[in-house]
Amino acid sequence: MDYAKKSLELHYQLKGKIEIASRTKANDRQSLSLAYTPGVAAPCLEIQKDVNKSYELTRRWNTVAVVTDGTAVLGLGDIGPEAGMPVMEGKCLLFKEFGGVDAIPLCIRSKDVDEIVNTVYLLAGSFGGVNLEDISAPRCFEIERKLKERCDIPVFHDDQHGTAVIMLAGLMNALKVVGKRLEDVKIVTSGAGAAGIAIIKLLVSVGAGNVVMTDRTGAIFNGRPGLNPAKQEIAEATNRACEKGTLADVIKDADVFIGVSAPGVLTSDMVRTMAHDAIVFACANPTPEIFPDEAKRAGAAIVSTGRSDYPNQINNVLAFPGIFRGALDARASDINDEMKIAAAHALAGMVGEDKLSCDNILPQAFDEGVGETVAAAVKAAAIKSGVARI
């Protein structure tokens, strides 16, 4: 199928993939008076007395803002906020279909960090959470940090944390299959953008001790000149042996490769130098760092990509709907590491021990109960970690 052509036809036909639906009627004088004036003054006054009543008397409790500036849309790059709208509408659709979450696209005509932060902060009272989407690095880190500091609702950059959650879930199961432990393996990553940095932070937080990140220049190590603040933070937390050189240099004897970078970055020759039963997560889209058949011929035991036409797809839709569902159900003030780790464990646990194999380390997006399972784990973690407000 020509997906580009068919999708364009669909978008012309629909003129938008989402819409507002009424939850009550206004078809006679009485129903109109209850839904709007004069009756609506009563809930307004309740919220005036206690702003938290906005979660009980409006749809705020179930509504998320999907925010972009259009600077890093898919693999298209900086195409502008309006051009990013089809993706944001699609994201909102997935929120609803997979998590029952009402989501509103907000495409902001600014690239200024503080302007974006202030805009979202001023609108935050209308929402139960904020999902940042397709904002270029390293600005995305600063925008998320500043919003988390100012907002009392969860702020979550899915390109970072959703990807990291799925990677962790997949890696936990992959390591089970090959009989290795996270704290013992050497992990080499390619790509130091939003996803790459978030993946490493989450892996380190759960006990990964031997991690080396690479970018276009090569291995990132403490003392390498020219590192931006985000990379410097990674340099201080990883690569304790201070390995230097190219990806080809540092991948020798690695147990795990995680790529969120560019097509063809990992070669068959590099895979051959990895440890026995190597795990390769090649998640550049749409063309991975190495194709699964090449990686397996070179000796990889388990290969995962971001594509649906190969086994073990790393697909963010497994995570973000359930994560937000759980956060909203807990009325959480944050989505913290405990909640992300709980989501990863929940996803990993959906593949039973009897079903685990080299070609089956993650559930599928359409498997029954994915969103509900993740949501329950996230809500429980929110309560346990003290960020729940219900």
Q: What is the meaning of each model-derived region?
A:
Residues 232-302, 307-309:
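Rossmann-like adenosine-cofactor binding region
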Residues 158, 178, 282-390:
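Adenosine-phosphate binding glycine-rich loop
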Residues 69-71, 79, 108-109, 134-137, ...:
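Short, ordered loop/turn segments at secondary-structure junctions
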Residues 1-155, 375, 381, 385-389:
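N-terminal ligand-binding/catalytic initiation module
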Residues 105, 131-134, 155-158, 189, ...:
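General beta-strand structural signal in soluble alpha/beta enzymes
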Residues 12, 55-60, 96-97, 122-124, ...:
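Solvent-exposed alpha-helices and their adjacent loops that cap or buttress functional pockets
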Residues 74, 79-96, 157, 165-262, ...:
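Glycine-rich phosphate/diphosphate-binding loop of Rossmann-like nucleotide-binding domains
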